[in-house]
Amino acid sequence: VNNQVTTDEVNSSAFEIDLLSFQLTIGSPIVVQIKHKEGCKPKVLNPEVVKPSASYTITSIASDADGKLTWKTTGESGTLPYIVEQYRWNKWVKVGEVQGKGTAGEHAYTFKVTPHSGKNKVRIKQVDNAGAKTSQDVPFTAKVAQVNYALDPAGKTITFTNTTSQPTETMYEVFDKFGNMMARGYSAKVDVSKLAVGTYYLNYDKSNAEIIIPKRK
């Protein structure tokens, strides 16, 4: 264990290693090496005990109108990423990650979310072997104009504009009728020239729309 030989009795078909005797601190690195004979590969029955756990406690979390999300935590137990999610299009969408510090002290984190128009909701979570541990929802109202879309008559380009008809960048997703994602990104235009004729579903800003790619000349 961390290059130290255990004093536990290991010359048997089943044995237990007592990690308490190594005086490890929560969140510190650990490497367990088991030397064995050829054809006698060991099986670890509870590997989760040396893996990071989502044990954090949030002491504060908030977002400003520009989407700057800040939070503080204590009680982390091992390095796990904080997954940042935003509620868009009637679902939670992953928008990024921040690597956790993994130790028990207080830690501060920041992530810039790209807001959509109007009221927003964001949250963070960590995922370990037991599942996901999710924070409360964090609401904020963004200073972002509503976005409109237009598909050109040739069915080759989707353009996003603001309320003054100026091109504006926004997050988007395009799905076919079977639910397969055909395009995803953040832009003022989407090239759909390679999509086959048919019906598609567009998610953009905070809205949804059905688009029809026409037969091209």
Predicted regions and their residues:
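Short, glycine-anchored, charge-dense loop/turn motifs used at functional sites
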Residues: Y172-M182, Y200-L202
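A short beta-turn/strand-edge loop motif at beta-sheet boundaries
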Residues: G75-G78, T163-E173
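Generic short beta-strand
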Residues: V84, I124, M171-Y172, Y200
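Short, contiguous hydrophobic alpha-helices characteristic of membrane insertion segments
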Residues: P153-I158, V197-K206
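Extended, polar beta-sheet/loop recognition surfaces of beta-rich domains
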Residues: A209-K215
